[in-house]
Design a protein with these regions (language model features):
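Generic structural signal for well-ordered alpha-helical scaffold segments
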Residues: 443, 447-454, 484
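Conserved SAM-binding loop of SAM-dependent methyltransferases across substrates and taxa
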Residues: 476-492
């Protein structure tokens, strides 16, 4: 919460608080609400005194119209004169009745606008004229409306305004697919081109028609054409997705411009959760509240229903939380009398003021909405709505550890790692090592594998009877430490081999072996696929130094009982885990050897991700392969399109890999790699000699999308079985990144973000849609 003098920079969307003692704003565990005040008939101009008074009450920002009533009157006179001229021509007896072109609005005069370049302007959100009609079927009204918008946007940009709100398309001109909406979208596209640095927010209701304040001088009555209406719907029937369809067309015409966003008007009765989730995925700049959005509690104070509170909590967890705008809830207190005693919205309020009110039925909500448009009821406190929102801010739930960790990663595109090609830096290893869940689960898998090994009385591959365990791709050694701990916990002795190709990590592993592991680990620097197995010195004990000279006694290579690796990628196999484990399987004991992980599966689902699509589209100019590249992303502002119920996506398995491979499969692969006759001569359908043909996968998946939407790409996840459990289901150890199973299998795991496969051409669909996916690996 911010109090005191406003100091807001609209270009970066940050607010500076003059009151440095505001503990709520400094609390990193709670979201900060930036709350603005909007009046349809705000007294002009908005002076420094008005801004200061608003800041003293607790507002962070104010809106202001770009042009004045004088400009409005001038435009109306221009239209009236032009229509009169047309009428005179039509009523004359002249043989050639050529219709004159639409008049051109003269440039602004000082009396036409309250704005001038100054610090005050930089602290305002501009609101374009609501009396224009960009959707009008009348070419004259549409032309004049477009001129007004362009004049306002150009002048606001000149003055240094950073954010402009434009009223959404009027729905009285027909459905979302009509020509009027296309006109509106092109007008917005033109406005964005005129002002290269202004952020434009389209003010739209979540569904239905927004409460319209009666306007004197509306251009609608000037239309000489009857507007078309959608007669296919009943009088009281509402198409819940109609407004989203309109927004989708606008941003599609504007090519997902990063400066285009939504100012979403919240109704008194919230729609179904699937529509709430759809808007959650969109670039929300503001959430707007009118008096009709609020309920009245027993004390007569405005409060939000539980559903609105939950929605606000969810939306405020976005990477860039929307600002909140109170619309026509009363004037700013103290403007008429600076000495007036006013309440300050500091987040503290008596229980009677913030006591919840029962949620209304749909009929009650509609009646309240109609009543609110007829008469504005006054609250007991002129700042009551602001006081309540500040109370909600102070009482927001703290962010969870996962939310804190992911705050900088939400919807941020990252290239998948290539550990086989690149030698990772220490800081990269460190990030993954911060995830205790993954390593706890690996340790649990090793513990159960060791315990079952003893219970099942399996022979070991060492002369001492210790279970031989190798960590293939040891990195900085976290799995080695967990393996030693598992041995200590179970009391089962192990012989540990740490294999690592990264020469820099190899240095650290040797240091750990000396200072942390007491020299009990055998550290080997090599690519795991080239490793021949544990070194066995015919004349010496197990664990002899790895590096030998020509005078060293003859050595042999033994087998490994348990092979541990952490080569999984966000889509299971996308970091070549199958190829790497196949390449080292020759060292695994053929009869009793265990691979951890034992198997893993890849999973897919279609999603709407407009923010990610916009980001990738912006990269395309510099990187022509941007749309062909998969990205690792911590998904947040997305909408699952194939769902059984809201927020419960239908995610389908694409394919599976298991380890160890059957010996016969390995022999065929080796024969093909060596060009042997037994390997055949057909090669591979994906090219090459066919040695990796056994890792080729194919999937055909079908998804049912119930609601209208746009497929921007595919979300990819994986599940892995680290240890099968030795025949006991309760001993099974699994990992998952799927949002519907992660809590049951590996809650709070953060090592892997999902993967995003973008579509070069988005797929739009209306109503029930069957999305069929054909994919190869």
């Amino acid at each position: 919460m911010a109090t005191g003098t406003l100091a807001w920079d609209p270009f970066v969307g940050e607010h500076a608080d003059a009151d440095a003692n505001s503990d709520t704003a400094d609390d990193e565990n709670l979201p900060t609400f930036y709350i603005g005040h909007h009046e349809f008939k705000r007294p002009l101009p908005v002076t420094e005194f008005v801004l200061r008074q608003a800041g003293d009450v607790g507002y962070d920002m104010l809106t202001s119209p770009i042009t004045s009533p004088h400009f409005h009157s001038r435009v109306l006179s221009l239209i009236s004169n032009h229509i009169a001229e047309i009428s005179a021509i039509d009523s004359s007896d002249a043989p050639n009745k050529a219709t004159p072109p639409a008049p051109i609005i003269p440039p602004l005069d000082p009396v036409d606008t309250p704005f001038t370049p100054s610090d005050t302007v930089s602290q305002l959100i501009a609101y374009s004229s609501p009396w224009i009609d960009l959707c009008s079927p009348d070419p004259l009204v549409a032309n004049i409306s477009r001129q007004v918008l362009n004049i306002e946007i150009a002048y606001a940009s000149f003055c240094g305004v950073g954010n402009v709100i434009i009223p959404g398309p009027r729905t009285h001109n027909g459905g979302s697919g009509n020509n009027g909406l296309a006109q509106y979208a092109r007008a917005i596209q033109e406005a964005l081109a005129i002002a290269s640095y202004i952020n434009v927010s389209i003010h739209m209701p979540m569904y239905g028609v927004e409460d319209q304040t009666e306007m004197t001088g509306d251009l609608l009555p000037f239309s000489r054409y009857q507007s078309t209406t959608d007669t296919s719907k009943g009088e009281n029937e509402i198409d819940l997705y109609e407004n989203w369809d309109a927004w989708n067309l606008i941003r599609d015409v504007c090519k997902y411009n990063s400066r285009l966003s939504v100012a979403l008007a919240l109704p008194r009765q919230l729609p179904i959760e699937s529509l709430q989730s759809r808007w959650f995925a969109e670039p929300l700049k503001l959430l707007t509240f009118t008096q009709s959005t609020f309920l009245k509690n027993k004390g007569g104070h405005p409060v939000l229903g539980k559903a609105h509170q939950n929605l606000l909590t969810r939306y405020m967890k976005l990477k860039n939380p929307p600002w909140l705008l109170l619309c026509d809830v009363g004037p700013i207190p103290g403007l008429d009398d600076p000495n007036q005693q006013i309440s300050v919205a500091d987040g503290y309020a008596p229980p009677s003021v913030v006591q919840d009110a029962p949620s209304p039925t749909p009929a009650e909500a509609e009646q309240a909405r109609r009543n609110s448009t007829k008469s504005q009821t006054k609250s007991k406190d002129v700042a009551a709505h602001l006081i309540y929102l500040r109370y909600l801010q102070r009482n927001q739930p703290e962010r969870t550890p996962i939310e804190k960790f992911g705050s900088g990663y939400q919807d941020y595109l990252q290239a998948p790692l290539q550990p086989l090609t690149d030698n990772l830096e220490s800081v990269t290893y460190e990030v993954f090592e911060k995830d205790p869940v993954k390593y706890d689960w690996y340790e649990r898998a090793i513990e159960r594998a060791l315990s079952d090994w003893v219970l099942q009385k399996k022979p070991t591959s060492s002369l001492s009877g210790a279970v031989v365990l190798a960590v293939a791709g040891s990195g900085r050694g976290p799995l080695v430490s967990r393996a030693l701990k598992a041995s200590q916990t179970t009391g089962v002795p192990i012989e540990v081999w740490a294999v690592e190709k990264n020469p820099n990590a190899y240095v650290l592993l040797q240091r750990h072996n000396k200072n942390v592991w007491n020299g009990v680990v055998n550290v080997v620097k090599t690519d795991m696929r080239a490793w021949k197995g544990p070194l066995r010195n015919a004349a010496g004990p197990i664990g002899q130094a790895v590096t030998t000279s020509s005078t060293t006694p003859a050595t042999t290579h033994g087998k490994v009982d348990i092979l541990v690796s952490e080569l999984l990628g966000s889509f299971a196999d996308n970091e070549l885990s199958p190829e790497c484990i196949d390449g080292v399987q020759h060292v695994l004991a053929p009869e009793h050897g265990i691979s951890i992980p034992a198997s893993y599966t890849a999973h897919l689902t279609p999603i709407l991700a407009p923010r990610l699509h916009a980001d990738i589209s912006n990269r395309f100019s510099a990187d022509e392969h941007a749309t062909d590249t998969p990205y690792v992303v911590m998904f947040h502002a997305i909408d699952f399109l194939a769902t059984a119920v809201p927020d419960h996506p239908q995610i389908q398995q694409a394919w599976e890999f298991s380890h160890p491979l059957p010996v016969k499969t390995l022999h065929i692969a080796e024969a093909r790699r060596g060009g042997g006759v037994s390997g055949g001569g057909g090669g591979s359908m994906s090219g090459g000699d066919g040695a990796n043909e056994h890792n080729t996968r194919y999937a055909r998946l079908k998804f049912v999308c119930k609601d209208r939407g746009v497929v921007n790409g595919l979300a990819g996840y994986f599940e892995a079985v680290l240890y099968e459990g030795g025949g006991k289901a309760e001993n099974k150890v699994e990992l998952s990144t799927r949002p519907d199973t992660i809590d049951a299998k590996s809650k709070d795991m953060i090592s892997w973000f999902p993967i995003f496969f973008p579509l070069k051409a988005c797929i739009s669909f209306l109503g029930l849609y069957y999305y069929e996916l054909l994919t190869y690996e």
